[in-house]
């Protein structure tokens, strides 16, 4: 079941029992300054106000309480708030320009891996400035989750993780504070689900 909430993730986390989720995969804002976000986007295209709350100790304490394992994108921007780890995930994009060629994620699990796939900007229509490919989330789930695991995403963003969980049969709870992003992600998931239901001719 895919369960999406248009809510502040802190409000939702407060309602969760300890270890309610086997795995949290989170892509939070990395900075409290919109200008510090990834360059190259048309500022009028996205709502940067929704991206100005980077992780803090209170958020991380709650996240670690409700989930048994965690994957946190952009951890190098808030490394001082996290426990030390030998496990780092690298998404290698094979691209040039304003964007970083590699994005890093912290993992509580004892394995480091590289997702080495060419980044194709035209593979989806962007609805969020830090949108990641569905294939990346599918890879994370196949390598870091087990069948039957319940997944948490506190910053749903574009909803790529929701599509990946739907494709692979994982239960997901996703939270998104910004109403516009939430509605866009929900619509994107619904369109994907409806396409899968179209009978073959």
Predicted regions and their residues:
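Class I S-adenosyl-L-methionine-dependent methyltransferase catalytic core
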Residues: 1-142, 146-152, 160-201
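Conserved glycine-rich SAM-binding loop
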Residues: 157
């Amino acid at each position: 079941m895919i369960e999406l909430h248009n809510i502040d993730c802190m409000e939702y986390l407060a309602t969760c029992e300890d270890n309610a989720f086997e795995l949290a995969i989170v892509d939070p804002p990395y900075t409290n300054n919109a200008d510090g976000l990834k360059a190259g986007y048309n500022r009028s295209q996205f709502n940067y106000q929704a991206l100005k709350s980077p992780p803090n100790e209170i958020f991380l304490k709650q996240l670690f309480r409700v989930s048994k394992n965690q994957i946190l994108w952009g951890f190098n921007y808030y490394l001082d708030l996290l426990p030390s780890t030998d496990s780092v995930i690298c998404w290698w994009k094979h691209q040039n320009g304003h964007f970083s060629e590699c994005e890093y994620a912290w993992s509580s699990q004892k394995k480091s891996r590289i997702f080495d796939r060419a980044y194709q900007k035209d593979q989806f229509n962007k609805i969020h400035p830090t949108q990641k490919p569905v294939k990346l989330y599918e890879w994370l789930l196949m390598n870091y989750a087990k069948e039957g695991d319940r997944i948490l995403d506190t910053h749903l963003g574009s909803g790529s993780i929701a599509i990946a969980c739907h494709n692979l049969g994982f239960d997901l709870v996703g939270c998104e504070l910004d109403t516009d992003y939430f509605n866009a992600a929900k619509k994107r998931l619904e369109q994907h689900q409806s396409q899968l239901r179209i009978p073959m001719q």
